[in-house]
């Protein structure tokens, strides 16, 4: 019983994504994003670099000048929850986004890529 209580408290404190995703699998999922984004260095491509993505305000990479008005005007801070929503269907989550990617339909893929982003912090 004590073990179950600890698991519940841990899940509530750290969120499901902290335990659900596999960063190694997430790195493989990220290959779908590499044509537009990088995570290794602060260099933009078609989309902004994703260095330091977790905890960053959306639309805040100063060197990236092609954000949509919707992205710049949003008050989103990227975390597991906001990334999951956005990566499910970017255009539905944020009307007016310029991101052409249709989204990651598989929940496991989203969990894994979020774990990958978290591992880069």
Report the location of each language-model feature:
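Positively charged n-region of N-terminal signal peptides that target proteins for export
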Residues: 1-4
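Bacterial N-terminal signal peptides
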Residues: 7-15
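Electrostatic cytochrome c docking/interface patches
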Residues: 14-30
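Residue-level signal for beta-strand positions within conserved beta-sheet cores that form or flank
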Residues: 16, 46, 95-97
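Gly/Gly-Pro-rich "capping" loops immediately C-terminal to redox-active cysteine motifs
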Residues: 23, 27, 41-79, 103
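The canonical Cys-X-X-Cys-His
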Residues: 30-39, 113
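C-terminal capping alpha-helices of c-type cytochrome domains
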Residues: 77-121
